[in-house]
């Protein structure tokens, strides 16, 4: 369905659909967090515990996509270019930054909400969660309904559906755009847009994973998030280099304060990635 929407509707349809999906996701998720926090009777512990070696992989995987992968900046840039084509006018830097910041903060807030749901509903239940996607989804919804009652089944189902749909359709659009742009930059003489070709490749690969590796979805997610975490310093360096290069208009370049913060962030990401690789 997502592939068909992107194939026929292109960016304009994606933009319209995602806005409503994210709005629905945000409302249902926040309501779920409020309800489950009201029902919770277990006191929360705020003692910081350094993860044992066995849990370090989970922490790294968690950081890899929290609140979003580092290459989200590439996705947003490509979507801005596409929006310029759709509108027939150039989106200003102020508008682009506002759009990015809103999306990033919403992602961050939703990430915190999902953490809260995990703490209130999943943590300490003793349930051994399945690595199979369908079984895990069933376990998750059953936990929520047993905690909040069957009346919230539809609310949780809508939140889960919009989460998966928004993630699928945005990734399914952004990755082919990134690959198509990469080929264009590597081979400037090529005039053909390979977006639809990469869309088919990604869709076909995704379906193949579902068919042959459905029982190992947990492992696949860990691999993807860990790789995202390890490659984060590379993307961060490229971003930092680009915004300081001559390709960025002088008036739009970051100030000294933001550049210092960027260097500190780059050192943080690099230190964590190198440290993780050393203890493997």
Where are these regions (language model features)?
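Membrane-interface loop-to-helix entry segments
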Residues: 1, 5-38, 50-53, 222-232, ...
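Membrane-helix boundary/coupling elements in multi-pass transport proteins
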Residues: 114, 153-183
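Selective recognition of specific alpha-helical transmembrane segments in multi-pass small-molecule
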Residues: 95-123
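Helix-loop junctions at the membrane interface of multi-pass solute transporters
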Residues: 63-97, 120, 181, 241-242
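C-terminal membrane-solvent junction of multi-pass transporters and transport-like membrane proteins
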Residues: 17-20, 187, 191-198, 222-277
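Hydrophobic alpha-helical segments and their helix-loop junctions in multi-pass secondary transporters
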Residues: 7, 23-50, 59-78, 236-248, ...
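Helix-loop-helix connectors at the membrane interface of multi-pass transporters/channels
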Residues: 1, 81, 85, 171-198
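Loop-to-transmembrane helix boundary motifs in multi-pass membrane proteins
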Residues: 106, 183-214
